[in-house]
């Protein structure tokens, strides 16, 4: 059962990463976007992706998950700087990614510390 769940979480995480890259490199959303503020979208996206990464790789150290997610966000920004994609790379986008990543890592640390406290 757990092995099937692990495979499912890894597959869902990989699929989500592909969708994020596809969206990040495709044409920019118009004014009808579900979340109108770009930075909120970045933070929310990386909040969800980081949570999915923790489920997909439960034995990976938190700092490694954070570094890998930051690298993923950085890679997206680098790719967006290539004129072929007609997108713009922004440090503020990467900072919003960090906020989303940090929020999940912070919750994971709080949960881990709470489990260590006596009942």
Spell out what each predicted region is:
Residues 1-92, 98, 102-119:
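Bulky hydrophobic segments
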């Amino acid at each position: 059962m757990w092995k099937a769940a692990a495979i499912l979480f890894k597959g869902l995480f990989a699929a989500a990463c592909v969708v994020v890259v596809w969206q990040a490199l495709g044409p920019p959303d118009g004014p009808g976007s579900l979340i109108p503020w770009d930075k909120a979208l970045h933070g929310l996206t990386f909040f969800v992706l980081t949570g999915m990464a923790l489920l997909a790789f439960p034995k990976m150290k938190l700092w490694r998950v954070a570094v890998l997610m930051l690298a993923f966000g950085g890679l997206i920004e680098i790719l967006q700087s290539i004129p072929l994609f007609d997108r713009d790379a922004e440090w503020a986008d990467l900072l919003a990614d960090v906020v989303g990543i940090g929020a999940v890592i912070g919750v994971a640390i709080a949960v881990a510390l709470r489990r260590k406290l006596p009942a």
